Curated annotation (Swiss-Prot):
Coiled coil: none annotated. The lineage of its organism: Eukaryota, Metazoa, Chordata, Craniata, Vertebrata. This is Mediator of RNA polymerase II transcription subunit 11. Keywords: Acetylation, Activator, Nucleus, Transcription, Transcription regulation. It comes from Mus musculus. Expressed in cochlea. The gene is Med11.
Amino acid sequence: MATYSLANERLRALEDIEREIGAILQNAGTAILELSKEKTNERLLDRQAAAFTTSVQHVEAELSAQIRYLTQVATGQPHEGSSYSSRKDCQMALKRVDYARLKISDVARTCEQMLEN
């Protein structure tokens, strides 16, 4: 269950980042709209620019944290909630067993042929 809560937490963080990107676009749009006017409201423009900058810094920090996490997971380092390594080891062991069976049957066939001659 810890795996699901960790995954849900990661997804929630990404959803928060997505909402923050929406806010960034909204702030940028408001600032551009204000700049297109003949007489700009400098206080509104300053507030929108400050909100834009703060949001961009927050998104950058959160995305960096997500990338660090994904890099750690992708490098094969063990971490809580990952069963990939165990599954891969099991798959490889099954393939080795199949290969051993194939070779043993080849040896048995060769022995039978030698006994017949």
